[in-house]
């Protein structure tokens, strides 16, 4: 047989439909070109936009955040309004060096509210008292336990850090209990966090700047970590009195913020509680206008972390016409680049 069989050529050499005029060709970054030398972060991300895969998603995330942070309009009363930006992050990101990037956003009043898990609260405070160190993912747990070293991925936290945290936080809890009993102060997770941010008085702290700039920090699972351990110990120390923390007041507070927003945006690093708490608050206004997810979760197991923005649209947590993207990546790898290309570029 000297000619290619028609069956094969008809299967392989199928003609395409005409390419739409607005189709975007794949492109990359040629560092031989003078304009790509000493590239700024915004230019780098802009060039990555055409690469495909997660590079394109990263570019979309930056475009959405830029629109989110720069939008200006008027509220129902005709007053100037900007996007209410909800920032969510998991505790491991505060344990990592990404804490400095998050602090930058809060210090410069670039977000409106924060949701984190308990570790995201306590680790910020503990880092003001003692260092966290680089380690290795492969370090053996039993050996680390014998030496009093706690592993968070490839980070190491000496257990002495938590002892220092207890010494620092328990007197504050004593004072808060006294204010509850004598002055009738009603504590919520966000007011507890605000008080701790005030007391830490350290400019490296996210919570210090949240207190200073009156940015509420919500943590519906405040007891799920070392701070919960300290609260547990305090119930015995203070018995028969007990510090009471009202979570219902905080759900009203964050939901009310969402409902009052002229536009609402979500920037969520990681998944689980922090992701859903913000999304559910946005449900109260029939969905967010912007959403950027950055995490590595997959949706095949039905997990909240793995769910794409489209699932939140089905629940009314993101508006059907909203601008949204999910970037499948470790936030420590890409979020500094996102911030450099958006919030920090001016």
Curated annotation (Swiss-Prot):
Pfam families: DS
Binding-site residues, NAD(+): 91-95, 117-119, 123, 224, 271, 296-297, 330-331
Gene name for this UniProt entry: DYS1
Its EC number(s): 2.5.1.46
Active site positions: 317
Record-listed spermidine binding positions: 122-123, 229, 276, 302-304, 311-317
Catalytic activities: [eIF5A protein]-L-lysine + spermidine = [eIF5A protein]-deoxyhypusine + propane-1,3-diamine
Source organism of this protein record: Yarrowia lipolytica (strain CLIB 122 / E 150) (Yeast)
Record-level GO cellular component terms: cytoplasm
UniProt name for this protein: Deoxyhypusine synthase
């Amino acid at each position: 047989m000297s000619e290619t069989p028609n069956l094969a050529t008809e299967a392989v050499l199928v003609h395409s439909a005409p390419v739409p005029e607005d189709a975007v060709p794949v492109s990359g970054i040629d560092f031989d070109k003078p304009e790509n030398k000493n590239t700024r972060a915004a230019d780098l991300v802009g060039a990555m936009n055409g690469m495909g895969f997660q590079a394109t998603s990263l570019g979309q995330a930056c475009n959405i955040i830029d629109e989110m942070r720069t939008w200006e309009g008027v509220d129902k009363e005709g007053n100037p309004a900007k996007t209410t930006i909800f920032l969510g992050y998991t505790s491991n990101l505060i344990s990592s060096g990404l804490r400095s990037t998050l602090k930058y956003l809060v210090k410069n009043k670039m977000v409106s509210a924060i949701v984190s898990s308990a570790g995201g609260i306590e680790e910020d405070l503990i880092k003001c008292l003692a260092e966290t160190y680089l380690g290795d993912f492969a370090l053996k747990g039993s050996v680390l336990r014998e030496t009093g070293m706690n592993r968070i991925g490839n980070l190491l936290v000496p257990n002495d850090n938590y002892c220092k945290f207890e010494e620092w936080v328990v007197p504050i809890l004593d004072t808060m209990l006294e204010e509850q009993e004598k002055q009738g102060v009603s504590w919520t997770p966000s007011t507890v966090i605000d008080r701790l941010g005030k007391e830490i008085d350290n400019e490296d702290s996210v919570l210090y700047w949240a207190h200073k700039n009156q940015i509420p920090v919500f943590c519906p699972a405040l007891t799920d970590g070392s701070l919960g351990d300290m609260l547990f110990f305090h119930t015995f120390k203070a018995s028969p009195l007990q510090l009471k923390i009202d979570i219902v007041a905080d759900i009203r507070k964050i939901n009310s913020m969402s409902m009052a927003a002229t536009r609402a945006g979500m920037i969520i690093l990681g998944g689980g509680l922090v992701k859903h708490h913000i999304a559910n608050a946005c449900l109260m206004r029939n969905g967010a206008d912007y959403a950027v997810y950055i995490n590595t979760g997959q949706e095949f197991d039905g997990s909240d972390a793995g769910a794409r923005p489209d699932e939140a649209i089905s629940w009314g947590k993101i508006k059907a016409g909203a601008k949204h993207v999910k970037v499948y990546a470790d936030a420590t790898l890409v979020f500094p680049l996102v911030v450099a290309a958006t919030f920090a570029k001016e």
